[in-house]
Amino acid sequence: MADVRYYGTGRRKHSVARVHLVAGDGKVVVNGRDISEYFGHETLIMMAKSPLVLTETEGKYDVIVNVNGGGYTGQAGAIRHGVSRALLQADPEFRPSLKEKGFLTRDARMKERKKYGLKAARRAPQFSKR
């Protein structure tokens, strides 16, 4: 019998995470490396694992993630979104708690574009009175 896999796609900023949940002992593998090796900061690891902690499924599933694009914060957010969606496939009863914490909502905030005549999105060149 084939092992049951639950799949979820997560996005944040420019990052896209493809997440697979497989019944296991709680290993989290990101791009072929352990999560603590991939993300140096404990806050990013906690962010990525937060849906598992919330639903108390941390030791029940192995999480296999393929993530690309963006920086580490965006990738951690994308993983959180993807894990939440995959958990929803595994058990639809997780929806209220995940929705309450906002883990199912795609964070639509993106980097604001640079405008011509300005140095950055909103930063204007230095003003000189005379």
UniProtKB/Swiss-Prot annotation:
Species annotation: Exiguobacterium sp. (strain ATCC BAA-1283 / AT1b)
A GO biological-process term: translation
Keyword Transcription: no
Family assignment from sequence similarity: Belongs to the universal ribosomal protein uS9 family.
Iron as UniProt keyword: no
Top-level taxon in the UniProt lineage: Bacteria
A GO term from the CC aspect: cytosolic small ribosomal subunit
MF terms in GO: RNA binding; structural constituent of ribosome
Keywords: Ribonucleoprotein, Ribosomal protein
Name of the protein in question: Small ribosomal subunit protein uS9
